[in-house]
Amino acid sequence: MDIEGVRMVRDYVQEVTGLELKEEQLEIFSRRLAERISELGFETPFNYYLAVKHRYKDTELVNLIDKMKISETYFFREEDQLVALKEWVIPKIARKAGNGPIRIWSAGCSTGEEAYTLAILCRELKRENPEFAHLRFTIIASDINEIALDSARIGKYSHWAIRHLPPRFVGTYVSTKNGGFEVAQELREMIRFIPVNLNDVASWDERRDFRFDVVFCRNVLMYFSDRRVPEIIRGFHRVLEGDGYLFTASTESLMRHTTIFKPIKMMNTFVYTKRET
């Protein structure tokens, strides 16, 4: 396959979305792209590139983004962070929030495993603590990949995706169905799945509902270039309340990109809070 044509397609998607596909990932992307080009009947990656750029951008870009998806996601990933959220962060916010809802954003939610995990934690906090039984939560889960969002809204998962889900939650928050698992309706009702391009930070300011107490953006920033990451982090700083918290993956340090957040050791993990600027 024409590797230069593949790179042109990759570079175009990167220009529009900010998603960066490393050279070592190009072979996987090339195979997926070849299948798509064959499905549509194009002769070369270059012809496909021209068609996407000038004729089919709105429809075909969705498929291209899906082809670039290489990461894995699953329920209850990095449990130390989840414990810190449930046992420390939410109680601290709740004691200041009064009767207002606690707003959580799962940015780059992919097929929804993280968002549903957050919903389970919120339900469990209310169930276990009478002090917090009155709490209301709003969870926004976003991704640029609309195919992934459609899957998230359906809420059906494989055994592999829920392999870290505590067994006591099976039957309560997920049920077996047709050889897989389906999340409970009460969880789906807690989450709004919406398309958001993290590369287009300016568009966040146009959304009136984009103010959050907690932002989760884990295993996402690694897909953006070093040039784009600081701008995305500044966007998180703007949409977080003054006493809000930002969670990134334990392998993703913000300190090499910016100093507008400060890390706080919390239980067995680190989270970030805003430095006021």
Q: In which residue ranges do the predicted regions lie?
A:
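Extended basic-aromatic, gly/pro-enriched interface segments that bind polyanionic ligands
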Residues: 107, 128-216, 220-228, 254, ...
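Core SAM-dependent methyltransferase catalytic element
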Residues: 257-277
